């Protein structure tokens, strides 16, 4: 699937969740978008660039409680990989990048990155967090020093949780965000 189809598909998924989560015991007012790598890119675009959710009658600021991005590519132009150029319709299209859609009123965000990630360099999260903060949005960045691109998500598995507290940090972010009447994420290590 190419840009923008995967974002349109993602928006349809969020619409379905909003309409159906109650049947499964969930709360339609407590929807968090979470993804790893390309999934983090999609989650960020849906949470930050309102045009995708508006197409299905939703709004990021109203319908998304928070964004959790794990090793996400948020600011990675120009594209060098030929496959990515095909997927995104060219090497230099800023409209495909979450960082270029940041405005005030975005949902609280938790951005997690591995200090040894060589596929999606940690600067993606740092730059995206700085842009979110500059727009007045709540953001927390967690950098796990000795972790690469794949282990950061593998650490969610029960046997690997002792090595990296990814799941514990996600749980704390969700709990704190939902406890706040303003839905403001904790600013443990804000980015200036």
Regions found by a protein language model. Give the residues of each.
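Primarily recognizes the serine-hydrolase "nucleophile elbow" in alpha/beta-hydrolase
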Residues: 12-82, 94
């Amino acid at each position: 699937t190419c840009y923008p189809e995967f974002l349109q598909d993602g928006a349809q998924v969020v619409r379905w969740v909003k309409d159906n989560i109650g049947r499964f015991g969930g709360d339609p007012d407590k929807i968090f978008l979470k993804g790893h790598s390309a999934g983090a890119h999609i989650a960020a675009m849906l949470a930050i660039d309102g045009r995708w959710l508006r197409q299905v009658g939703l709004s990021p600021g109203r319908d998304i409680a928070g964004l959790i991005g794990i090793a996400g590519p948020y600011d990675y132009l120009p594209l060098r990989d030929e496959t990515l150029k095909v997927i995104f319709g060219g090497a230099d299209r800023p409209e495909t990048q979450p960082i270029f859609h940041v405005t005030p009123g975005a949902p609280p965000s938790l951005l997690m990155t591995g200090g040894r990630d060589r596929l999606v360099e940690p600067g993606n999260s740092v730059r995206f967090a700085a842009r979110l903060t500059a727009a007045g949005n709540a953001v927390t960045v967690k950098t796990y020093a000795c972790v690469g691109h794949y282990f950061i998500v593998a650490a969610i598995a029960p046997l690997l949780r002792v090595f990296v507290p990814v799941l514990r940090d996600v749980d704390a972010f969700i709990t704190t965000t939902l406890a706040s009447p303003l839905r403001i994420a904790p600013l443990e290590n804000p980015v200036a």
